């Protein structure tokens, strides 16, 4: 309020006193937290005649680059008419919805004599990184070489990160090797790039070779194994990190809680919670949501609900993880009641919400209610069904004694989900789950284990195939095999576990990973409280 009041006083003043008044104006512009305030200040500068003082204009230009309105920033830049102050424009493109326009702007001003520096290329490369266009990246790299900026470490780090984001890991590795004096950002960038491109073991090897590590380095590796479905290693890395003298930050704790939940390690999860109570006076929606998610996955739904009910701030992900906890691990009716409260509170559900709701209906045997929710999802909320929703409906019909409808639901996939992989798994699951014939499923699962013996999902799939036909000795045998190979603890067999595994096997489907494997917890980082 005080800041807005100062803006109003500045805007309505009849004149601006040079010296102290000018500095106060600079401060108001730089501290403005709203582009509307910036427009007001801009207008006042023009009407008072002070905008044409280049120092005012440049300060305004720098402030405008924070708001993501690149066209507004470009208009200020063009009105100044000075080529050398173009760098804020690249920053504006970076936070805007049109980063790909940055390269065109660069070549436009280059024709008029603009001389780029290392700051130019760091921002420009970051813009190209967001577009994932490796050809544009190479073009920018060539420009950095031409203007003598390619040996500047921040530029080299930016190029390396850009190449990994564009899938050109070999180019990134080549750059890394050629950097004579690497800093910790260089190491973190290449390790994160290896993880991003699926080479977790090589990333871990390089991580072990790092001369110095920071908390970001540890978070990268903890997250890497969590993303590779090996939460046990993530927890081991955290312990190693603590022994090395690092305390972790909010991101570390969210990753750790996620790992505890996904591996059903309630004891470790409680320990993290106790540590949070001892060390963090002010909680956050991210941490609170991670705690709810962890307790829910460890089947302590009552504890999860107590935390949920105590929160003053919740976002969509908070609601989703609580609904999922009830519907998958607790009393399904509690999740359905929470869903009704969610939509009555005018919070729009998403595809993850309906995964929980439909699974809850399957567990409770509520066929007509499940059909109604499915129709609500499609007709009212315009959410297109994916593999996950079809699988939930298949289990709903199967548990109610309608195997034909179950098979039909699973095979009736959306066009974009129909791939050789999804069709194969649909047929496999139909035969294994609904008709009680595990022979085909057993054969495929074993062949998958042979091709990737460290992927716990394949063992988990085999255990579920055995469990649906009551082959409990075989289930225990696979469990022992998992322990001997130290692949990591596997949660108990059940409807959700099988569903999660199958959905994750729909290769290349980012939507699938978001719906089941991660239960969308990672969205907490970007979702705002509601």
Swiss-Prot record:
Belongs to the PPR family. PCMP-E subfamily. It holds the Pfam family PPR_2. The keyword Lipid biosynthesis does not apply. The lineage of its organism: Eukaryota, Viridiplantae, Streptophyta, Embryophyta, Tracheophyta. GO terms for molecular function: RNA binding. GO terms for biological process: RNA modification. Gene3D superfamilies: Tetratricopeptide repeat domain. InterPro entries: E_motif (IPR046848), Pentatricopeptide_rpt (IPR002885), PPR_At4g14850-like_plant (IPR046960), TPR-like_helical_dom_sf (IPR011990). PPR repeats lie at residues 82-116, 117-151, 152-182, 183-217, 218-248, 249-283, 284-314, 315-349, 350-380, 386-420. Residues 424-499 are annotated as: Type E motif. The keyword Flavoprotein does not apply. It comes from Arabidopsis thaliana. This is Pentatricopeptide repeat-containing protein At3g51320. Keywords: Repeat.
């Amino acid at each position: 309020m005080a800041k807005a009041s100062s803006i109003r006083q500045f805007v309505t003043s009849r004149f601006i006193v040079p010296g102290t008044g000018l500095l106060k104006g600079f401060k108001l512009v730089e501290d403005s937290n709203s582009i509307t305030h910036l427009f007001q200040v801009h207008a006042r500068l023009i009407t008072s005649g002070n905008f044409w003082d280049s120092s005012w204009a440049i300060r305004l230009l720098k402030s405008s680059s924070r708001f993501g309105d690149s066209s507004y920033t470009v208009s200020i830049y063009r009105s100044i008419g000075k080529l050398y102050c173009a760098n804020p424009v690249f920053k504006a493109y970076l936070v805007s919805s049109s980063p790909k326009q940055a390269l065109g702007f660069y070549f436009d001003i280059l024709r008029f004599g603009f001389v780029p520096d290392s700051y130019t290329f760091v921002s420009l490369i970051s813009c190209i990184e967001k577009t994932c266009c490796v050809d544009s990246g190479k073009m920018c790299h060539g420009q950095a070489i031409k203007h003598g900026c390619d040996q500047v470490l921040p530029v080299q780090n930016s190029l390396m990160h850009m190449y990994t984001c564009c899938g050109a890991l070999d180019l990134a590795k080549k750059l890394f090797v050629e950097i004579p004096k690497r800093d910790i950002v260089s190491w973190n960038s290449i390790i994160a790039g290896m993880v991003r491109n699926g080479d977790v073991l090589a990333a871990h090897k390089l991580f072990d070779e790092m001369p110095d590590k920071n908390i970001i380095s540890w978070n990268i590796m903890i997250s890497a194994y969590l993303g590779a479905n090996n939460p046990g290693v993530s927890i081991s890395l955290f312990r190693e990190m603590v022994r090395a003298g690092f305390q972790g930050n909010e991101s570390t704790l969210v990753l750790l809680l996620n790992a505890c939940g996904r591996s059903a390690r309630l004891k470790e999860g409680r320990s993290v919670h106790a540590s949070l109570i001892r060390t963090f006076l002010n909680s956050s929606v991210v941490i609170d949501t991670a705690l709810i998610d962890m307790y829910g996955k460890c089947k302590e739904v009552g504890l999860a609900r107590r935390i949920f009910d105590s929160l003053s701030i919740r976002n969509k992900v908070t609601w989703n993880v609580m609904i999922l906890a009830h519907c998958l691990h607790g009393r399904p009716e509690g999740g359905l009641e929470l869903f009704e409260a969610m939509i009555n509170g005018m919070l729009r559900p998403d595809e993850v919400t309906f995964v929980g709701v439909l699974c809850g209906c399957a567990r409770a045997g509520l066929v007509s209610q499940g059909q109604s929710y499915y129709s609500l999802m499609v007709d009212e909320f315009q959410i297109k069904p994916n593999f996950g929703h079809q699988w939930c409906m298949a289990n709903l019909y199967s548990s109610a004694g309608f195997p034909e409808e179950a098979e039909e639901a699973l095979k009736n996939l959306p066009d974009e989900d129909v791939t050789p992989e999804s069709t194969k798994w649909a047929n496999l699951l139909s035969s294994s789950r609904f008709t009680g014939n595990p022979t085909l499923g057993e054969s495929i699962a074993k062949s998958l284990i042979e091709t990737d013996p460290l992927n716990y999902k394949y063992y988990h799939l085999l255990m579920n195939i055995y469990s649906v036909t009551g082959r409990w000795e075989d289930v225990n045998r696979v469990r022992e095999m998992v322990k001997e190979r130290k692949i990591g603890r596997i949660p108990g067999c059940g409807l959700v576990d099988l569903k999660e595994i199958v959905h994750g096997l729909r290769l290349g489907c980012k939507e699938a990973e978001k719906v089941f494997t991660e239960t969308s917890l990672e969205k907490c980082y970007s979702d705002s409280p509601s």
